[in-house]
From Swiss-Prot:
Keywords: ATP-binding, Hydrolase, Nucleotide-binding. Signal peptide: none annotated. InterPro entries: Glyco_hydro/deAcase_b/a-brl, LamB/YcsF/PxpA-like. It is an enzyme of class 3 (hydrolase). The gene is pxpA1. One of its GO terms (biological process) is carbohydrate metabolic process. Catalyzes the cleavage of 5-oxoproline to form L-glutamate coupled to the hydrolysis of ATP to ADP and inorganic phosphate. GO terms for molecular function: 5-oxoprolinase (ATP-hydrolyzing) activity; ATP binding. This is 5-oxoprolinase subunit A 1. Forms a complex composed of PxpA, PxpB and PxpC.
Length: 256
């Protein structure tokens, strides 16, 4: 079995560093790079792109609300036309830096509050995904399980890599538990490893309430800002390899 292992990276800003990106990039097959709105800046984007190219891992745009102070995790009420332009702006920024480095963007994902809102609202997901398709009809959408995003992508003939968030708790609708709720972020390496093993063995995840629900995933995501992210990534890799899995960049899984 082949599966992608990806992480959200490049989420520092200026002199401020977030996460251990260099170590994480040695362990993953695809990187989701902040594009300057919820985090990141041109120099961080450039160095992350060049490191991804050197390691041969897939490069993805991680687009979010214009909310540096809130790290893109606060809901914002923005006119839909403007929000679509914000998404395209971020895609263009990373694609430009990648082109200058002789590399390319293979996939994108919606960050934080924007991702949660789009996953739960077809009227929001449709226009946002359409904006992505207009930018690049070959772009892969990387998303946690979401009927809204998957149907929008299908309507635009875009491929979707459904993602399992190894360090986040799920509810019984297979949506992410809000971060403000106790237990929403999974930090224990053994617990993360067990969750990944369960996913690979029977395609399920145990929800915060203790119920098993089915999860369809081609990719496993780890947040770079989760405490102990490097140790968690090693645990995930070990679990995948222990189950006979092969870690593979998302574009190779979906034939980009």
């Amino acid at each position: 079995m082949r599966i992608d292992l990806n992480a959200d990276l490049g989420e520092g800003f200026g002199a401020w560093t977030m996460g251990e990106d260099e170590a994480l990039m040695q362990l993953i097959s695809s990187a989701n790079v902040a594009c300057g709105f919820h985090a990141g800046d041109p120099l961080i984007m450039d160095s992350t792109v060049r490191r991804a190219k050197a390691l041969g891992i897939d490069l993805g745009a991680h687009v979010g609300f214009p909310d540096l102070q809130g790290f893109g995790r606060r809901r914002m009420n923005i006119e839909l036309k403007e929000l679509c332009a914000i998404v395209v702006y971020q895609l263009g920024a990373l694609a430009g830096i990648a082109t200058a480095a002789g590399y390319r963007v293979t996939h994108m994902s919606f960050h934080g509050a924007l991702g949660n809102m789009a996953a739960a609202d077809a009227e929001l997901a449709g226009p946002l995904v359409k904006a992505v398709a207009r930018f690049d009809p070959q772009m892969i959408i990387s998303s946690s399980s979401s009927e809204a995003i998957e149907q929008a992508a299908q309507a635009c003939n875009l491929r979707v890599a459904t993602t399992f968030l190894a360090d986040r708790a799920y509810d019984e609708n297979c949506l992410l538990v809000p971060r403000g709720i106790a237990g929403a972020v999974v930090k224990d390496p053994e617990q993360v490893r067990a969750r990944v093993a369960q996913l690979l063995q029977d395609g399920t995840v145990t929800t915060l309430s203790g119920k098993r629900v089915a999860v369809n995933a081609q990719s496993i995501l780890l947040h770079g800002d989760t405490p102990g992210a490097v140790e968690l990534a090693r645990s995930i890799r070990h679990s995948i390899e222990e189950q006979g899995g092969v870690i593979t960049p998302v574009s190779q899984l979906l034939g980009s």
